[in-house]
Amino acid sequence: MPKPTKGPRLGGSSSHQKALLANLATSLFEHGRIKTTEPKARALRPYAEKLITHAKKGALHNRREVLKKIRDKDVVHVLFEEIGPFFADRNGGYTRIIKVEPRKGDNSPMAVIELVREKTVTSEADRARRVKASKKAPEAAAAAPQAAVEPEAAEAAPAPDAPEAAPEAEAAAPRPADEAEGSSED
């Protein structure tokens, strides 16, 4: 059962408010973001989010329910074919309201309402964590054999502070085959 809205109506009458919200929602779905007054943005947010929830379901009944409110068939098509599937894995919070500077003429508070197009922060954080872990895994695997070799080398070689130790270490180090052949030819 429809319940009356508390407080004053946007535009004066309830029919004007319905038309106003339908037009704002049409513009929002068409352009992705709109700049409007803050009270209109706050009234539009739940209205638009309910329409997106209908679009996520995607059934014919839901499409007809949305067509009762938004008369532009092209916008409804975009809503059901692009916007709804984009938010399929998101439970609410499809829009964002950002306050901007007041309007110059009458100093009324303005806001930008937009569709949240980027994925959630948690999914980005999970992806970043997986990438970081995948980078560490090969490095750790490569570092493990080197770590086993390094203690042996540290025990065999004297402290690197001694200058005479460096030539001995170079002499003890195996030379590549090309250098070995070149020195035997001399």
Curated annotation (Swiss-Prot):
It holds the Pfam family Ribosomal_L17. This is Large ribosomal subunit protein bL17. Residues 123-186 are annotated as: Disordered. Part of the 50S ribosomal subunit. Contacts protein L32. It comes from the Bacteria. Belongs to the bacterial ribosomal protein bL17 family. The lineage of its organism: Bacteria, Bacillati, Actinomycetota, Actinomycetes, Mycobacteriales. GO terms for molecular function: structural constituent of ribosome. GO terms for biological process: translation. Signal peptide: none annotated. InterPro entries: Ribosomal_bL17, Ribosomal_bL17_CS, Ribosomal_bL17_sf. Residues 139-175 have a biased composition (Low complexity). It comes from Mycolicibacterium paratuberculosis (strain ATCC BAA-968 / K-10) (Mycobacterium paratuberculosis). GO terms for cellular component: cytosolic large ribosomal subunit. Keywords: Ribonucleoprotein, Ribosomal protein.
